[in-house]
A protein has these predicted regions:
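Active-site cofactor/cluster-binding pocket
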Residues: 1-190
Length: 190
């Protein structure tokens, strides 16, 4: 099994953290892992993306042009990466701020309203964990226990008190991801 993922959005949305947590989770499952970040010079507000590859075989190259899954968090990333999803692949996105929704009919498209749900939870910083939860519902490639361990490894120890909140956010994302129908733009709860 090999899963090639691109996660893309604005800096400050937790794009790189989401990728790092997936990478740590894969390592804990004895998988081959690649984590390749890319970002502009801005600390926040610029675009950022990370390619994560999890595989039970050796990874020949971390550089990819097409992906099994794209997790899209802003319009610029939608414009850039929608066409990079392999036919039969998955595109997951937060519709907040998306003006031009995906149009491909040869991939499975899902929405998870991470921004709205994080606001409802009272902490916008868990946005990325909600989206990660949605991804894990659709592509359960790593065990939830390993994701929590990945959180512990990626969060500084002074923030470990936030792990229960992050776990709750992941669960909320798993419960709130919808299939997006390109033809009539309806979403169906999974």
């Amino acid at each position: 099994m090999t899963e090639e993922i691109i996660i893309a959005g604005f800096g400050g949305q937790g794009v790189l953290s989401m990728g790092k947590i997936l990478a740590y989770s894969g390592i804990m499952q004895d998988e081959e892992v690649s984590w390749m970040p890319s970002y502009g010079p801005e600390m926040r507000g610029g675009t950022a993306n990370v390619t994560v590859i999890l595989s039970d075989e050796r990874i020949s190259s971390p550089y990819l042009k097409v992906y099994d899954t794209a997790i899209i968090l802003n319009q610029q990333s939608m414009d850039k990466f929608e066409k990079s999803v392999k036919p039969g692949g998955v595109l997951i996105y937060d519709p907040n701020g998306i003006v031009m929704h995906p149009t491909r009919t040869d991939i499975d498209i899902y929405q998870v309203e991470g921004n709205r749900l994080a606001t409802e939870m009272g902490n916008k910083k868990v946005f990325n964990m909600i989206v990660l939860g949605g991804f894990l519902k659709i592509r359960p490639i790593v065990k939830l226990d390993n994701v929590i361990e990945g959180l512990k490894k990626s969060l500084p120890e002074r923030y470990h008190n936030l792990i229960p909140l992050n776990k709750k956010a992941i669960t909320k994302g798993m419960q709130n991801i919808f299939l997006y129908n390109v033809e009539n733009q309806l979403t169906n709860h999974l």
